[in-house]
Regions:
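Terminal-region recognition feature
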Residues: 1-118, 124, 129-130
Length: 133
């Protein structure tokens, strides 16, 4: 499979109107990207894991990207969409990565019943990534 097809920004661009989006945070090597954009003219917040970086495993920094995406969606009262292709927790971050997943789950629970939460699973998704909405 082409790495272009796995790129989280490419996946976000395919989902949104006219591939027009704005990153919430500067892109790093954390394995997670978040952006705002429009789908059929409606504002959404989207986050996507990057399976080309450590198999999409989610660490501390990547978890914070998701939490920020949820905060942005809650603040704007718009849907949040997660694009998952993740190997679960980034074990190289140690026990702290498990705590970071807890922060993601807390953001999901806080948003429950308040904004729409949509998950797209586009590849293998293990551990915490499999427990999203």
């Amino acid at each position: 499979m082409s790495t272009t097809l796995l790129d989280p920004e490419a996946r976000i661009a395919k989902l949104l109107d006219s591939a027009n989006y704005e990153l919430l945070l500067p892109r790093t090597d954390c394995g997670m990207v978040a952006a705002t954009g429009l789908i059929k003219g409606n504002k959404v917040v989207v986050f996507a894991s990057d399976p080309t970086i450590k198999g999409g495993a989610l660490g501390i920094e990547g978890s914070q990207v998701i939490v920020q995406a949820y905060r942005a969606a809650m603040g704007a009262q718009v849907p949040v969409i997660g694009i998952w292709h993740s190997g679960g927790a980034r074990l190289s971050d140690g026990v702290a990565s498990l705590n970071a997943f807890g922060e993601v789950f807390q953001a999901m629970v806080t948003a429950s019943g308040r904004i729409p939460q949509i998950s797209l699973v586009l590849g293998p998704t293990a551990g915490g990534g499999a427990y999203g909405p």
